[in-house]
Amino acid sequence: MALPERFRPAVSPLSDPGQVLVGPTWRITILTERLLRLEWSDDGQFEDRATQVVWNRDFPPVPFELTRDGDGLHLTTRGLQLAWDGRRFSPGGLQVRQPGVRDWRSVWHFGDAETVQEREPGWHVGNLGGTARTLDEAEGAVPVEKGLLSAFGYATLDDAASLALDEDGWPTPRVGDVDLYLFVHGHDAPAALRDFHALTGPAPLLPRWALGNWWSRYHAYSADEYLALMDRFEHEGLPFSVAVLDMDWHWVDIDPRHGSGWTGYSWNTTLVPDPEALLADLHGRGLKVSLNLHPADGVRSFEDAYAALAERLGLDPADGDPIPFDVADPAFMEAYFDEVLHPLEEQGLDFWWVDWQQGGSSSIPGLDPLWLLNHLHFLDSGRDGRRPITFSRYAGPGSHRYPVGFSGDTVTTWSSLHFQPWFTATAANIGYGWWSHDIGGHMFGERDDEMVARWFQLGTWSPINRLHSTSSPFQGKEPWNFGGPAASVMADALRLRHRLIPWLYTMNERAHRLSEPIARPVHHLDPRPETLLSGSGAFLFGTGLLVAPLTTPAERRTRRASVTTWLPEGTWHDWYSGLRYTGGRFVTLRRPLETYPVLARSGTIVPLVDGDDLSVANPEALLVRVFAGADGEFVLYEDDDAAQPASCTTRFAWHQDEGVFTIAPVVGDASAIPARRRYRVSVTGLAPSDTTSAEGTTSYDPATGTVTVDLGEVAASEGASFGFAPAPTASDQRIDERIFAIVHDLQVGYIDKHQLCAFLESTPSTLARIAGLESLPIAQDIKDVVLEVLLAGAE
């Protein structure tokens, strides 16, 4: 049957004939200088349709040289050299080399095993990993699938098991025996991702509201209880943009003759007497709403939509027979969306949480139901001019087209927290950029306020920040349920996440346009053994930021947790304290509970919401953070959040030598942003300056070395600029003051404190302090926390 247009993705699967070499049973397509398609078909049939993974093979022509050698050939582009003996593909007969690379391991042979490296650094390195379907019930590390990068510079994407998409966009059996895409990008991760997204489709532009804080909990909320919770969040000044209702929104305690209550499509009107009123109230608070779906048990006679669905499918509703859930039947799926899901959306639902946990088999051989559910839900959600979104588990390469990812129900332990940053960043190696995790852990484990606070801090600096937990009354993630400083740390993490939305939304647009996932392994910027082998979990976050998550408890005496990571070349500023670090080395970062290791490279510019605005709208006021020491620019992207957005950009630029900051006039359709906007600009890493060419007020924070200029209101169409006179110099690191604060905080004997301070006071030279510290008769962890600051001061 013909599917509605909304279920037919735009594809362009035919390659330029001039880029295709073909024989009776083989075909080689030069897609880019570093991407080849290699096919073998015993019956001479080759797949020209789009597949579940690959949607586009229509690449611009690239130059190549071809030399025939009997039945074989030699093919050369600027990025690779292929040699083939003309026989059935084999390890000895088909090889690809990387020009200029001498390591024998960099030569790809057909059939080479591409094992994923071990989780921790080790002598064996292969493929650098991609991601996994789920973290359900995981406590710590899980195996991940292959990605597009390896230590040896090549990786393959095997598309032979993919189903083809017919003219209606429906999955169908394919032809051909071997269908392999060979990525030969060396360690150029950005180029590999650009080619991959050109081949499979770009990452979509997420709605702006998806980048705020999500509230979710497996709990049988009544409407009154849920709204009271939202009232409490507002009273506490805790901003949320998404409200997720887990499965208790529908009837779960059903007549046993119908089976399990796991699947449901009808509101539990005992808990929610007026669903439309609840949804309208949540919308009035600026929240988007998602409902949980476990669709595997089909639609049964007690459901509100049963009669309409039965009649649509030609069944007699009076029979009362369950209607099986058949994801492989296009007639059923079209009716399912139209008769079951759309009426709920018309009540005010914004998007679905597709919680499929019933395996990978269907009535179409080779079809994983999860993939088709993700595919159809995402496409359906974009109808009527809406920006599409779904929320589900990963279903293999190409799943980046269906954000947001749901990683599943993890165990609440430090080992789970330790694995998540690495897992999130490594997913970028397969172009998958929008994982959301159960921040704080989902189930089991044990209560540890420090651990949950650190998880919240990680959530701030994650692609998606979604709080979630099981139904246990002891595992809710409301910050006020946690004791001591943890509660305020958690609240501050949520507030900072919300303030980052303008910057995050620009990163969202970059991910869509430039194939640059927001969270990426450090080797994407600085590929070297120290980063390719790194097991620290540190990752790049957007443009110019590096996050080094704290995933182990604090040391008792120092009250600080620590992490060691490679820091790429350049000068890096601590986001919270302003302390500067010199890169090109390993650094160990130690932080008390109140702060987190987030470093900004000199020249980085980050715009944030200024003030206490809890909405996700394009803000009336911005605080623009600038990290001095190098020139930098940032182009802020804003739009109206439509599927075909009216968008505009505002360019911020910092000129280090001149000490000038510029806000350029807006470019594009500015109808979605304020005509006038209040600006404050904070430049970190500068000595105080008494003079500025800006109109407005200037203040200085000596603790962080930050000059803040309040520009007042600036017309978007005009922009503004200011400069410092004389030209700015770097701020004093205030090393002694920082060390005194650390020593004051140490949980050790006072004699040790005095001894340490006396040594520092009598030794003014930084190098002498570093050398002499080791000889002091105090514990090593105390020396280490002081050494971090001394090394930073030795720049």
Where does each model-flagged region fall?
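Solvent-exposed beta-strand/loop surfaces of large extracellular or lumenal domains
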Residues: 49-63, 574-593, 689-712
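Short, well-ordered beta-strand segments enriched in hydrophobic/aromatic residues
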Residues: 28, 36-38, 75-82, 546-549, ...
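A low-complexity, Ser/Thr/Gly/Pro-enriched, surface-exposed linker/loop concept
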Residues: 6-7, 31-70
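Accessory, solvent-exposed terminal regions and/or long lumenal/extracellular loops of proteins
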Residues: 602-697, 711-716, 721-795
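Catalytic and substrate-binding clefts that recognize carbohydrates or anionic sugar/phosphate headgroups
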Residues: 66-208, 217-218, 223-224, 230-235, ...
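A surface-exposed beta-strand-loop module
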Residues: 72-74, 80-81, 700-721
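Aromatic- and carboxylate-enriched substrate-binding clefts and catalytic-loop regions
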Residues: 97, 104, 239-490, 523-527, ...
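Catalytic core of carbohydrate-active enzymes
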Residues: 378, 397-405, 419-423, 427-437, ...
